[in-house]
């Protein structure tokens, strides 16, 4: 777990010609919750001690818009609104990153309910560090991911979701039409 930061804007060498993604809340709002690139970039000169956030880690807003998160699939940095979360090396073979992506929505809610207000709102990081994440077997993680990815696709994709919804409504219409208009002839 590491905090994000903003390299000095007064040092053009930190920004000009930068290729390293530097994430802000605007990136999530414009590009969604799985990010490979950012709107703004920095140079390696702007990176403290040369330590980037590793690919396949998460950025989680722990101040301001608390609980917003994204899976970042490229080495990067983020501003101070975000805390970077990555999987420990000892757990990498036991965790599917997309499972954690979906579980982050649970963590988002937890963060919103565990806030310190001292000058400005922020997540209670002492409690956060003690937060336990359940890790089901890989097979169960795969099953959960498959189900949640399908629902996500249906709810977020006009290309997939809307046609599926139309097909479901058409099927529902046909069912009720057939039931409502199926008059059995009475024989006398």
Regions found by a protein language model. Give the residues of each.
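Charged, alpha-helix-forming regions
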Residues: 1-188
